[in-house]
């Protein structure tokens, strides 16, 4: 989901921060997704390729937007999504049952925290700081609820 939305933001975003964040999301999440696919494949697990209904709705809603409205909604959605991702990956890194998945979560968590911080900064800039992530500020970001 973050890859698809990141590509859309990089092309459709009107502000530089949205375009840069979107490109970072597409790049970082593509790498993480490929690594996760390799882990899953080595264990004989097939990961879902379809986006869940909630995220399909988010993609559809954003696809119908343009201009500043798109930028603001994308920023808000990415902050919310990355807040959830960081929580899920932290839980997996701390107490996951599978050592390979646990290691993947621990390795990916700092990247997601960077994305969370960047999403927070982007949201603050575009939406007047309505939400806080608790992360540190950096540059551009990346996310995908079931996958990084």
Give names to the regions the model predicted.
Residues 1-148:
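His/Met- and acidic-residue-enriched segments that coordinate or traffic transition-metal cofactors
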């Amino acid at each position: 989901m973050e890859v698809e939305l990141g590509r859309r933001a990089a092309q459709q975003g009107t502000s530089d921060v949205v375009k840069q964040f979107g490109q970072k999301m597409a790049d970082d999440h593509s790498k993480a997704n490929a690594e996760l696919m390799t882990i899953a494949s080595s264990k004989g697990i097939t990961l879902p390729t379809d986006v869940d209904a909630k995220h399909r709705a988010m993609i559809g809603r954003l696809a119908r937007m343009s201009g500043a409205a798109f930028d603001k909604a994308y920023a808000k959605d990415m902050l919310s999504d990355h807040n959830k991702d960081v929580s899920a990956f932290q839980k997996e890194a701390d107490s996951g049952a599978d050592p390979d998945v646990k290691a993947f979560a621990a390795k990916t968590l700092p990247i997601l925290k960077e994305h969370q911080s960047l999403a927070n900064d982007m949201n603050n800039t575009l939406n007047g700081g309505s939400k806080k992530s608790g992360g540190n500020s950096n540059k551009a970001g990346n996310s995908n609820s079931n996958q990084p």
